[in-house]
């Protein structure tokens, strides 16, 4: 089988992390976001992955080719000269997707359990052109709702932000298509959700697969952290060995709840880590540090007695001693935060040195 991943554009919602690398390469649970998808695809026999890219293709190719080789997956880059929406990239990559076998299409922001084997079986059983994975949400009025037959899965309609209850399932950004869909898509900017799917549903060719378990679009910081929490909880409930805590944790340190610590990271004495924390490769956490609901990306350090809550610390950062960082701070790569400072909801661009408090939400340029 083949797959196409919609890599998209500039990753503006996840800035400043995406100012120094493409969004699919941002570390999520200690590996590039896209790698979670590629590993799951490889497990169900996908041997060719097309990346629909329009931004920093060279950086993506340099890193993801190494992972693709390890997984035995052929990587093809389909470069958009102009934005083509969510359907146009399929037309551009048509020659790579044509054939008798169905193919996957994924939005690169999505994290879930990726039940691709069940999706393939569902798609083959109904035998039509397309399958959309759908997921349950608590407030369907905020989304576009997919209306479908609950028994067979055939999609009847799409209702954008309904004011009256019509259902609670939304498009999860994971699809399987037969190559017939390619005849529906012109090589121009086209929305698959607004232009192609309604047409397919009207002709009875589109079915909904209900995702079991967790799902999150992690394209912005708040959802990135929520998705991380859901991912760690999934690792816990499935007793996954991904919840490694490594051997470089001081015996006086306390681990609370679901925590992932890369084996190459170190955690100092009397630290309290967790719940819902990911500590990346070669990170150094000094003594007495408290971290909760946060991720510390690779090669960063946190000084003595600092506090990090509900925040993302980018790569190669140095956070001083007695620093307090909270309320969805997003610290870009290679940032220095001096000792005894308070950052509240700050978004700090890469390569900055912070020497004053940021007491309210602000962008530090």
From Swiss-Prot:
Residues reported in the UniProt entry to bind GDP-alpha-D-mannose: 109, 217
Residues annotated to bind Mg(2+): 109, 217
Membrane-spanning residues: none
Active-site residues, Swiss-Prot/TrEMBL: 161
Matching PROSITE patterns: HEXAPEP_TRANSFERASES (PS00101)
GO process annotations (BP): GDP-mannose biosynthetic process; IRE1-mediated unfolded protein response; protein glycosylation
Region (Substrate-binding domain): 2-221
Known partners and oligomeric status: Component of the GMPPA-GMPPB mannose-1-phosphate guanylyltransferase complex composed of 4 GMPPA subunits and 8 tag-335/GMPPB subunits; the complex is organized into three layers, a central layer made up of 2 GMPPA dimers sandwiched between two layers each made up of 2 tag-335/GMPPB dimers. Catalytic activity of tag-335/GMPPB is reduced when part of the complex and binding of GDP-alpha-D-Mannose by GMPPA induces allosteric feedback inhibition of tag-335/GMPPB.
Family: Belongs to the transferase hexapeptide repeat family.
Record's protein name: Mannose-1-phosphate guanylyltransferase catalytic subunit beta
The organism of origin for this protein: Caenorhabditis elegans
Gene this protein is translated from: tag-335
